[in-house]
Amino acid sequence: EDGIEYYADTCLPLIDAVSRKKIKFNALARHTYPGKRLTEDTKGLNSIGYWDANEPQDWGLDWHRNEGIEIHFLESGSMPYSQENQELELLPNNLTITRPWEVHKVGNPVIGMGKFYWIILDLDVRRPHQNWLWPDWIILAPTDLEKLTNILRQNEKVCWKADKRILDCFQKIGKAVDSDIEGSNASKIRLLVNNLLLLLLDLLVVEEVQLDEKLMNSSRSVQLF
């Protein structure tokens, strides 16, 4: 599909950097995403984790799409990042949101130094017009979840400035990933992901983002692909 691989095929540079001890990496994942294995208790979560680069790097993740919505968060350092037609330099506390059809790359061409977190949730969509199906362990009240879904579907702003609560949440996610043994932290991770989505809703509502319903219609899917 227009020559762009899904993430599963493009994470080889990361795996290689880890094997060369260039970078600290820890993740919980399923399918072909790298990391310790997630259990069925977090079904719908495809990857959650971080990397921490404390020396200059010689690799990057080329253009790719994810099988799910991805939230990135940079705790420290700086990170060249591109999404669709925008090139950015992410700074500490920057958060990015990538929908499954949005092509993006990390590094230009190499990644920066710093600590970088991500979470990928599979919502069973690959195109903008499809309805989002959240995992059944996402427990936001229906009105809140609908509000969050609509905001995420009807705007395409790439980068947000996160607050200390979001930083705290990602730091707790990092600790939960580190100490997980074969799914032992599944409940903790479920709660942290729910908390993150609630904090994200707060952030998006405060920012009063401009919504555009046209971003959800099927002609847009055709236009993109």
Predicted regions and their residues:
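A hydrophobic/aromatic-rich effector-binding and dimerization subdomain
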Residues: 1-20, 25-49, 105-179, 206
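Short, Lys/Arg-enriched N-terminal segment that forms or immediately precedes the first helix
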Residues: 56-59, 208-212
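N-terminal regulatory/effector-sensing and dimerization cores
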Residues: 47-144, 182-183
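A general structural signal marking secondary-structure boundaries and capping sites
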Residues: 100, 177-181, 200, 204-207
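A generic fold-level signal
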Residues: 40-43, 66, 90, 111-113, ...
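A short, Lys/Arg-enriched amphipathic alpha-helix from helix-turn-helix/homeodomain DNA-binding modules
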Residues: 163-171, 189-193, 197, 201, ...
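Pocket-edge positions in alpha/beta enzyme catalytic cores
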Residues: 63, 158, 213-217
